[in-house]
UniProtKB/Swiss-Prot annotation:
It comes from Dictyostelium discoideum. Pfam families: RasGAP, RasGAP_C. Disruption phenotype: No change in cytokinesis as gapA can functionally replace this protein. Null cells project numerous filopodia, show increased cell motility during growth and form multi-tipped aggregates during development and show elevated levels of F-actin that is organized in large leading edges, membrane ruffles or numerous large filopods. This is Ras GTPase-activating-like protein rgaA. PANTHER family: CALPONIN-HOMOLOGY (CH) DOMAIN-CONTAINING PROTEIN, RAS GTPASE-ACTIVATING PROTEIN WITH IQ MOTIF. It comes from the Eukaryota. It is found in: Cytoplasm, Cell cortex; Cleavage furrow.
């Protein structure tokens, strides 16, 4: 209704609303104080009934009331029915009806393909694990061979008197990680911290406030990297989601989230300091800042300070000392026309600059780092769920706090910290930026200036006019997809990495993290959970004693190649129970769709037939269904073994899962489509990784062969042929090898030992044939490989048991080196 319609009604209050041609002329002649009953158009009155008679009007109202009650009852029934549908609490009859109402579209169902992809994925994962083990073994053998070669060179240098003396400044491997097993334990520890957010999300609440900044630096900048990689970003965002959930579960109002002693805001501030955040500030805020600074403006708005500045300018211009009082009140200064004129001009300039920043911020929404936007989305969604009494504006204020006050404003008032301007900022320019930031802060806080900052009140109009823009901007910030889609990573991500993740971490960071976890282990992990991965790793580290105290200024860094000690848990995610559940649900859905419609229950007091009853009746009615139904019932029993359902409630939990799948069929199929795409991508990546591993193994084998050849080059030069030249043979008596410490034990009888000669030769690099001869006849032949001996040495094995004799590993290596390498 427009303005004219409102005025027509108010000018003639006695006019009747319903239009009738017979009474129009009489309605303006006189006013009657008797209240009239206004009735809507006639629907239920008879033609000969008069509106002035009360009973027909009452009957009309009763009919409308009854009609309203029926509509309300239908709405309540529909709401109840929808709640049941969405929760999956449907009977078999209702599920079947719903299936019959849906269009069967087999082409868009990818259950079978997804399960096949998962089976292939597990197969490829296992194959890749085998290849990775082979590759690691080759890598270790190469390292041991090189180390052995180095030891030989040291011996030769000692003999020739050429070995250089050690200098005081020579770097040694840090004692903290000088043991390979200890190093591996730390690599397992930091991998677990990186991939299981529950541990770090718990730790941040257990550290002392004075340790918070350094700990967050370790967590965010060291453990997850400063530069953007999808894997680290995905893991870090998982940590933030869990931390926000924990934080908001322990506060009373959404406003408490912004208090100084809460943890998550500090985490978010640290997150914003990463490369993505600083790159955004340099690209968006930096140019505007430079433009404002170079203008050499003065945006002081306090009237008394403006008044004092005008007096100073007059003194400089005239060269005469002013007799005016500089210390005047706010109100007194505003009585001076030049002050009000100056302030008005500065307000206009301030608004213009605020417009520049606001336009830059809003227009660069798509350049805002994804992680910051997604964290804001989590804050909004979790706050909306936890604090149902909070208004949308109250939640948006929290988003504005993190986006502006803790991110953009920090860079505006201290641009040199982010290297946004290439010059020193004059105090006046910095004060200008502070004034601009205050105005924008009020805008992002949906607030206006009051009596405490009266000089900013002229900006209130501009703030009010742009509040809608800011609300829209903050709402658009949280319109982002999930990390799985944006970053193209998922739970199969770890299976497709060509190289293990690596972090560069300082020794104090390793020690501090170790000490922090040791101190708070019982708070992080329940005492009864002895098989918890964190407890297992910490138990291994405890075997090496407590971490040493390392000075905070010790800047030595080490590279940790992170590894998963619990690799089997990844394959367990692709459990047969999950596959069987999906398969059985699909079988039940297909069967219910094919069966004739079940009769509807007439007596609502009776219990609806359960799934087992329906299946048994179906196979009695149609014996051809016996194999399929038997398979379903067998699967249900297996699912019960996996604790995925139970016969105690007649498999109602399974039926609920079937109902939810049918109700949400379209959404589930879309999820299946995405899952299929992800699995296909993961499988392709695994196969690419497999090709890469095979290539690496081939290169490592060649390199290992080259290393072996270098070991033999001195000896082989004495032969006419190089690679295939046979070196040796070398002959030793039993007593000689025993005296050298090579043979440490033997089951050979004493009387026979004197007659035995050992002949050692090599026609393949790194492989040694040892023949035991008696009276010139071979009694026994053994084959030793230097790689195997070096590996035994590396794991601390001191002896090697062969048939009837036991060799000392170290002395055997020494002998072979001396014979074939020196």
């Amino acid at each position: 209704m427009n303005k004219e319609e409102y005025s027509d009604i108010s000018d003639s209050e006695s006019e009747e609303v319903h239009e009738t041609n017979n009474h129009n002329e009489h309605e303006h002649e006189e006013e009657d104080d008797t209240p009239e009953i206004v009735v809507p158009e006639r629907k239920f009155l008879k033609e000969d009934e008069d509106y002035s008679v009360p009973f027909p009007v009452m009957r009309e109202c009763l009919v409308l009331l009854l009609q309203s009650r029926r509509i309300l009852r239908d709405m309540m029934y529909y709401r109840f029915k929808m709640d049941r549908f969405l929760s999956g609490n449907l009977s078999v009859f209702e599920i079947q009806n719903l299936l019959h109402s849906q269009r069967e579209d087999k082409e868009s169902d990818w259950i079978a393909e997804i399960q096949e992809l998962k089976r292939n994925l597990v197969s490829e994962v296992r194959r890749n694990h085998t290849l990775e083990r082979d590759l690691n073994r080759l890598d270790k053998r190469i390292a041991l061979l090189i180390k052995n070669r180095g030891n030989i060179q040291d011996v030769l240098a000692d003999k020739a008197g050429l070995k250089a003396p050690k200098h005081k400044g020579d770097q040694k491997k840090p004692e903290l990680i000088n043991d390979p097993k200890k190093l591996e334990a730390y690599q397992n520890l930091f991998y677990l911290l990186q991939t299981e957010p529950k541990y770090l999300a718990g730790l941040v609440y257990l550290i002392q406030p004075e340790q918070m900044e350094s700990f967050l630096g370790t967590v965010i900048l060291t453990l997850f990297g400063d530069a953007f990689t999808p894997r680290e970003e995905f893991l870090l965002l998982s940590l933030y989601r869990l931390s926000i959930q924990k934080e908001m579960a322990n506060i009373a109002t959404v406003g408490d989230f912004l208090k100084a002693d809460t943890v998550v805001p500090k985490m978010i501030i640290t997150y914003n300091k990463r490369k993505q955040g600083t790159d955004y500030l340099k690209a968006v805020i930096g140019p505007i800042l430079s433009n404002v600074i170079k203008q050499e403006l003065n945006l002081e708005l306090k009237p008394n300070l403006v008044y004092a500045a005008i007096i100073s300018e007059q003194e400089i211009r005239t060269g005469e000392k002013s007799t005016l009082d500089r210390n005047v009140s706010h109100e007194k200064a505003l009585e001076v026309p030049e002050v009000t004129k100056t302030i008005k001009a500065r307000v206009d300039q301030l608004i213009s600059i605020c417009e520049q920043f606001l336009d830059g911020i809003i227009s660069s929404l798509n350049r805002l780092p994804y992680g910051i936007r997604w964290i804001c989305k989590q804050i909004y969604q979790i706050a909306e769920k936890n604090f149902t009494k909070s208004t949308q504006d109250e939640i948006l204020k929290v988003i504005g706090y993190f986006i502006y006050y803790r991110f953009i404003q920090v860079a505006m008032v201290s641009p040199e910290e982010y290297d946004l301007v290439g010059r020193e900022i004059h105090p006046t320019a910095r004060k200008n930026l502070i004034n601009v930031s205050k105005v924008l802060q009020a805008l992002f806080n949906f607030a206006q200036f009051g009596s405490s900052e009266k000089h900013f009140i002229p900006l209130n109009g501009w703030i009010t006019s742009h509040m809608g823009d800011i609300k829209n901007y903050l709402q658009e910030i949280i319109e982002v997809g999930e990390p799985e889609d944006y970053l193209q990573v998922d739970k199969y991500m770890e299976l497709t990495q060509k190289t293990k993740p690596v972090i560069i971490i300082s020794l104090p960071e390793i020690c501090n993290t170790h000490q922090l976890i040791s101190k708070n282990l019982d708070s992080l992990v329940a005492k009864g959970e002895k098989d918890d991965p964190m407890r297992i790793i910490m138990k291994e580290l405890d075997e090496f004693g407590p971490p040493p105290d390392i000075a905070a200024d010790d800047d030595r860094e080490v590279q940790l190649t992170l590894s998963n000690k619990f690799q089997k848990t990844i394959e367990e995610e692709l459990s047969p129970g999950e596959s069987l559940l999906s398969q059985t649900k699909e079988m039940v859905i297909s069967l219910l769709r094919a069966l004739p419609t079940l009769p509807e229950q007439k007596d609502q007091s009776d219990e609806p037939p359960n799934l087992v009853d329906v299946l048994n009746k179906a196979r009695q009615a149609d014996p051809s269904l016996e194999p399929e139904i038997k398979k379903i019932l067998d699967n249900l029993k297996k699912l019960e073994e996996y604790n995925l359902t139970t016969s105690a409630d007649n498999y109602s939990s399974f039926l609920k899962a079937v109902a939810l799948e049918v109700v949400n069929r379209a959404e589930i199929r879309e999820q299946q489509k995405k899952e299929k795409q992800r699995l296909t991508t993961s499988l392709n990546n695994l196969r690419k990784h497999q090709k890469y591993l095979n290539e690496q193994i081939a290169q490592y084998n060649q390199y290992l062969q080259d290393c072996r050849l270098k070991h033999y080059q001195n000896k082989s030069k004495k032969k006419k042929k190089g690679d295939g030249a046979k070196v040796g043979p070398f002959k030793f008596s039993f007593s000689e090898l025993h005296k050298k410490g090579v043979i440490v034990d033997s089951e050979v009888p004493q009387i026979t030992r004197k007659k035995i000669k050992f002949v050692i030769s090599s026609d393949t690099v790194g492989v040694f044939d040892v023949s035991a001869k008696m009276a010139g006849i071979d009694v026994q032949t053994m084959r030793l490989e230097l790689d195997d001996l070096l590996e035994l040495n590396s794991i601390g094995t001191t002896t090697l048991e062969l048939d009837q004799i036991t060799l000392d590993v170290n002395m055997t290596i020494h002998l072979l080196n001396k014979l074939f390498l020196y």
